[in-house]
Amino acid sequence: MPIGDRQNPSVEKKKNLFRLCPFWQRRSTTSSSSTQNPNQNYRSRHGNRNTDISAVSKPPLTMSSVARSLLPARRRLRLDPSSYLYFPYEPGKQVRSAIKLKNTSKSHTAFKFQTTAPKSCYMRPPGGVLAPGESVFATVFKFVEHPENNEKQPLNQKSKVKFKIMSLKVKPGVEYVPELFDEQKDQVAVEQVLRVIFIDADRPSAALEKLKRQLDEAEAAVEARKKPPPETGPRVVGEGLVIDEWKERREKYLARQQVESVDSLS
């Protein structure tokens, strides 16, 4: 074999290795192209980056928004009593309790009662709408069942029955319907869950005196709502006779003018 046809073994190995690793070729080609067109590569890289940022950009979270998400919802109602409903313990009878609700927010607020014992309890009124600063007394009725096996019911202890009071911000002029709370579930706030406590009806106590006082106020509020509103229109006298004050004054004036004219003629 001629000497000119022979090749150096080390050179042949480098060629074979270069063929087996094609990414070296791509790398060299890329580096050469980037060297030839540096401005074009810079624009393409930075242009793509700006497009991606604008596509995924989101408004930054502020401390106030994070705090609002962590803090509980602000209450709209002030309750009295605030945690428990006191009932006189009289087995076999329907007893009453009372609670005062006041709208402490700056907007009209609807409220609604719910109970875990709807068969033996009901509220009057079951719900309503309060203007800012307005108050209402609600009366809660409950039937007290006889204890099983003639066991004596422990007094001044929490019962299993609970009442939940919910609130909802509404616009002025909106009338209360229970469906309001179903249509706007995301905006409903739970004001309080009240537990039932039975107290001795024959033993004087501060809780019993306060309960009697609130029941009297609730009854007075119900009677006041039953009275018709005061009349602001024309007064009605007899059967369909409407007396307008302006017409009455005008008739008196005309009568006085006629008397004066008669006196002048005489």
UniProtKB/Swiss-Prot annotation:
Keywords: Coiled coil, Phosphoprotein. Signal peptide: none annotated. The modification Phosphoserine is found at residue 264. It comes from the Eukaryota. Residues 219-229 have a biased composition (Basic and acidic residues). Residues 200-228 form a coiled coil. GO terms for biological process: response to osmotic stress. GO terms for cellular component: endoplasmic reticulum membrane; plasma membrane; plastid. Residues 76-199 form the MSP domain. Residues 28-57, 219-239 are annotated as: Disordered. Induction: By treatment with mannitol. Pfam families: Motile_Sperm. May play a role in vesicle trafficking. Belongs to the VAMP-associated protein (VAP) (TC 9.B.17) family. This is Vesicle-associated protein 4-1.
